[in-house]
Amino acid sequence: PAGPFRIPKCRKEFQQAQHLRACQQWLHKQAMQSGSGPSWTLDDEFDFEDDMENPQGPQQRPPLLQQCCNELHQEEPLCVCPTLKGASKAVKQQVRQQLGQQGQQGPHLQHVISRIYQTATHLPKVCNIRQVSVCPFKKTMPGPS
């Protein structure tokens, strides 16, 4: 089977990590609260460099994000992006169902989905995973990447 798990080991890690449950919740939360509060996703709003320098940085993460980072740190670097992609896909399906029930498909759905991937793309960086900085999810990224 194709999909994000061309590396069988990563599929196993994804299952062991309970499909990155905290990351899924985090992605879902970020995508749904569009435009409110700090988004933790976009480079310009969140200066990673300061965070690296500043030992207090990581403590300011919301607990859910911290849990998600812990999940990612347990993955092998090789599997971080594939497992995140798996998590993003799962969230995308949840969102599609949720918005479908509310009759909100179309542009709004696209917007939310692009936020899921945008958030996921930067998670390794937000979580200070040394070997991975940004996951190359190109497919659903609108505009120039």
Swiss-Prot record:
Outcome (variant: residue 125 to R)? In 1.0104/SIN1
Gene Ontology molecular functions? nutrient reservoir activity
The propeptide segment or segments lie at 40-54
Q: Which InterPro entries match?
A: Bifun_inhib/LTP/seed_sf, Bifunc_inhib/LTP/seed_store, Napin/2SS/CON
Q: Tell me where on the tree of life, at the top rank, the source sits.
A: Eukaryota
Q: Which Gene3D superfamilies does this UniProt record tie to the protein? A: Plant lipid-transfer and hydrophobic proteins (1.10.110.10)
Q: What is the effect of changing residue 6 to G?
A: In 1.0101, 1.0104/SIN1, 1.0106/SIN3 and 1.0108/SIN5
Task: Respond yes or no to whether keyword Disulfide bond is given for this record.
Answer: yes
Q: What is the effect of changing residue 100 to E?
A: In 1.0101, 1.0103/SA2S2, 1.0104/SIN1, 1.0105/SIN2 and 1.0107/SIN4
Q: Which UniProt keywords apply?
A: Allergen, Disulfide bond, Seed storage protein, Storage protein
Q: Which family, according to UniProt? A: Belongs to the 2S seed storage albumins family.
Q: What does this protein do?
A: This is a 2S seed storage protein.
Protein name, per record:
Allergen Sin a 1
